[in-house]
Curated annotation (Swiss-Prot):
Residues 1-19 form the signal peptide. The modification Methionine sulfoxide is found at M40. Residues 107-146 are annotated as: Disordered. This is Linear conopeptide. GO terms for molecular function: toxin activity. It comes from the Eukaryota. GO terms for cellular component: extracellular region. Keywords: Cleavage on pair of basic residues, Oxidation, Secreted, Signal, Toxin. Residues 20-34, 58-80, 104-146 form a propeptide. It is found in: Secreted.
Length: 146
């Protein structure tokens, strides 16, 4: 009985939320209907477990194991495998050992690396020593006030 009252309340509130235009009534008057007086007794309901409701009804997963998902049946596992340029031989590393990786870094051309100097300019920026004196033309880390 309680479920029937709740279902009726949901139905009435849904009808009030989306009113349909009726002949002879202005469009705004459709929202002005009041609830059924029998449904007003729902305000005095106490909380607690509803009758007929099992304790394990609200589970975080679907306990209905007979109905599987579609992708379990028709999806090819080979399609789902992650592919990259290094996965030709299963999970073989791109470099067999650490020495091979260091050889790759030193023997390959430098412009292939993301940290390569793009303009091939001089990377020597001079002495980065903090100095409090104000010397023109030299880099300073901080001012005298610091």
């Amino acid at each position: 009985m309680l479920r029937l009252i709740i279902a009726a309340a949901v139905l009435v509130s849904a009808c009030l939320a989306y009113p349909q235009r009726r002949e002879g009534a202005p469009a705004d008057a459709a929202n002005l209907q009041s609830f059924d007086p029998a449904l007003m007794s729902m305000q005095g309901m106490q909380g607690g477990q509803m009758p007929g409701m099992a304790g394990g009804q609200f589970l975080p997963f679907n306990p209905n194991l007979q109905m599987g998902y579609k992708r379990d049946f028709d999806e090819n596992l080979e399609k789902r495998k992650q592919h990259s340029q290094f996965n030709a031989d299963e999970n073989k590393a791109p470099f067999d050992s650490e020495e091979n990786f260091m050889n790759f870094l030193h023997n390959e051309k430098g412009d292939k690396h993301p940290f390569a100097n793009v303009d091939s300019a001089d990377t020597d920026l001079g002495q980065f020593e903090p100095s409090a004196e104000n010397k023109n033309g030299e880099f300073r880390f901080f001012d005298k006030e610091q």
